[in-house]
């Protein structure tokens, strides 16, 4: 019997405020609602899904380190850390787990400081501007990538 594939979904700072914070940019769904949809999608594909949201950079880095050898794919919305965190980039490169970067809003249509990502050039893909559905698309792509490896 083969072990189930495992996908880790990481969400960065302030995403715990989804549903309340700037709904014109981020939509009205809460993070809990988004994660529930992802869990259902993963279960249907016989995939284990883990989730962590943190406002602390070091907690996200620790989760990435702990994923080594245990997680097959990462979906990450680094939020504001996108534009500032070389440490997150280094952690992802260090564990060499494939990842997709997700953003609810179109970061390229917003303030200039949001246009640069420290992760995008190393990601398997980047999804932005599609709201909460972007997570579903990222999970579908991750599942397809894992199935192709089997």
From Swiss-Prot:
Signal peptide: none annotated. Keywords: Amino-acid biosynthesis, Aromatic amino acid biosynthesis, Lyase. It catalyses: 3-dehydroquinate = 3-dehydroshikimate + H2O. One of its GO terms (molecular function) is 3-dehydroquinate dehydratase activity. The active site is at 26 (proton acceptor), 103 (proton donor). PROSITE patterns: DEHYDROQUINASE_II. Catalyzes a trans-dehydration via an enolate intermediate. Belongs to the type-II 3-dehydroquinase family. This is 3-dehydroquinate dehydratase.
């Amino acid at each position: 019997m083969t072990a189930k594939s495992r996908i880790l979904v990481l969400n960065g700072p302030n995403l715990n405020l989804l549903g309340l914070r700037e709904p014109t940019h981020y939509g009205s769904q809460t993070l809990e609602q988004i994660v529930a949809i992802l869990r259902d999608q993963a279960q249907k594909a016989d995939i284990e899904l883990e989730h962590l949201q943190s406002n602390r950079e070091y907690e996200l880095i620790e989760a990435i380190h702990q994923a080594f050898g245990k997680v097959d794919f990462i979906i990450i919305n680094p939020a504001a850390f996108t534009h500032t965190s070389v440490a997150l980039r280094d952690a992802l490169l260090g564990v060499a787990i494939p990842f997709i970067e997700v953003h609810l809003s179109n970061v390229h249509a917003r303030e200039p400081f949001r246009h640069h990502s420290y992760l995008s050039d190393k990601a398997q893909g980047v999804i932005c501007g599609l709201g909460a559905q972007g997570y579903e698309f990222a999970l579908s792509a991750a599942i397809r990538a894992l199935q192709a490896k089997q």
